[in-house]
């Protein structure tokens, strides 16, 4: 009861946190908090004044995008790590909830698609550069010690990376319409296939065929290295053009999933059957980009869903989608060999423990 207004009950209660959504975030992304007494009020004369709580991830102060009594959006600040989130209001501290937060593992990159991982657990990422401009280093290798070292040079505008069944790294160049084949030590680079327009996303099927997305409307199929037709290019399917790049990933059933980001907020993931027939697998995303799958067949795609950006998880049958990781500027991801994931923004790779096993890519 208020001492100034004895007939008015006191509204000061400790905030109570029930759950957080989504499952994880990177700095710049926001967690949605569900609970009670998140927004307290004080009796100040005849007025009831809302009092914003203070939020912290561990010892790192955080700020709100929105606060209501039972729901709030709190933004993950730079420097935050996986820790307990608490709210404090009028001297009362909430119960803690663990917040899973990704931490930077490499920066000063120019990422336009998924990173790639080799059989030894090394991670590879591009420094793509502005169109038509070469960068001093084209691809970096990030070892288990999290040290980034130059891996390949002199590839113009690297746009996608994928490991082939021959253990070589393949890289597309959107400026040249070419896919390059790079030896495991990065000391030998050769042209594998060329003449593919604005070559962007790449992926291998189980037979070792390479699929390349020309963002102007064509998916090419390229004969595998070591076959009777290595590097030979065929038209596999056609799609609506993309303003940026195609991103490709294979399902266990042999269907090729493709995103083709544009300016629409209601975009699709396409599924292309082995015979080239194309259908819409899921619709309702904003600017979908890099995608990956887990061993259960769930699809993870860098996209916006209902106005929030991050990694969206879609069920294997395409019937349901949810924001799984919150983060602005995300362009792709890949699963590592220890249940963790590498998340790519335009300039930084983040490491995040998810406890998820990714689908083998070849």
Region spans (language model):
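Edge beta-strands of extracellular beta-sandwich domains
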Residues: 92-102
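A short beta-strand motif characteristic of beta-propeller blades
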Residues: 100-107, 146-152, 187-193, 231-239, ...
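Immunoglobulin-like IPT/TIG beta-sandwich domains and homologous Ig-like subdomains
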Residues: 2-93
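A short loop-to-beta-strand structural motif that recurs across blades of beta-propeller domains
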Residues: 136-140, 177-181, 218-221, 268-270, ...
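Beta-rich, blade/repeat-based domains predominating
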Residues: 108-121, 126-131, 135-137, 154-168, ...
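Structural signature of WD-repeat beta-propellers
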Residues: 143, 173-174, 214-215, 273, ...
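Flexible, glycine-rich linker and terminal segments associated
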Residues: 322, 340, 346-362
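Short loop/turn segments that connect beta-strands within beta-propeller blades
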Residues: 100, 142-147, 182-187, 222-228, ...
């Amino acid at each position: 009861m208020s001492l100034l207004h004895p007939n008015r009950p006191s509204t000061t209660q400790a905030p109570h946190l029930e759950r957080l959504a989504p499952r994880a975030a990177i700095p710049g992304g926001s967690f949605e908090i569900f609970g009670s007494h998140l927004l307290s009020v004080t009796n100040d004369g005849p007025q009831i004044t809302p009092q914003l709580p203070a939020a912290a991830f561990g010892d790192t102060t955080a700020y709100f995008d929105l606060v209501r009594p039972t729901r709030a959006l709190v933004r993950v600040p730079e420097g935050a790590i996986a820790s307990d989130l608490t709210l404090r209001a009028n001297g009362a501290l909430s119960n803690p909830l663990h917040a899973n937060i990704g931490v930077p593992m490499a920066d000063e990159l120019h990422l336009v698609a998924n990173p790639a991982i080799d059989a030894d657990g090394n991670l590879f990422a591009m420094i793509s550069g502005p169109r038509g401009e070469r960068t001093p280093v084209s691809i970096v290798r990030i070892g288990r010690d999290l040290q980034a070292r130059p891996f390949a040079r002199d590839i113009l505008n690297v746009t996608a990376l994928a490991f082939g069944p021959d253990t070589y790294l393949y890289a597309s160049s959107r400026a040249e319409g070419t896919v390059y084949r790079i030896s495991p030590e990065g000391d030998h680079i050769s042209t594998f296939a060329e003449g593919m327009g604005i070559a962007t996303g790449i992926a291998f099927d189980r037979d070792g065929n390479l699929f390349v997305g020309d963002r102007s409307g064509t998916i090419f199929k390229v004969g595998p290295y070591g076959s009777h037709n290595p590097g030979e290019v065929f038209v596999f399917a056609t799609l609506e053009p993309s303003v940026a790049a195609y991103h490709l990933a294979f399902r266990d059933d042999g269907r090729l999933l493709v995103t083709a980001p544009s300016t629409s907020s209601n975009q699709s993931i396409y599924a292309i059957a082995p015979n080239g027939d194309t259908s819409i697998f899921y619709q309702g995303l904003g600017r979908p980009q890099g995608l990956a799958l887990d061993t259960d067949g769930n699809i993870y795609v860098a996209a916006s869903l209902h106005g929030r950006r991050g990694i969206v998880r879609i069920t294997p049958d395409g019937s349901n989608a949810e924001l799984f990781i919150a983060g602005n500027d995300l362009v792709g991801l890949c699963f590592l060999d220890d249940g963790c994931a590498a998340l790519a923004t335009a300039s930084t790779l983040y490491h995040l423990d998810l406890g998820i096993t990714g689908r083998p890519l070849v």
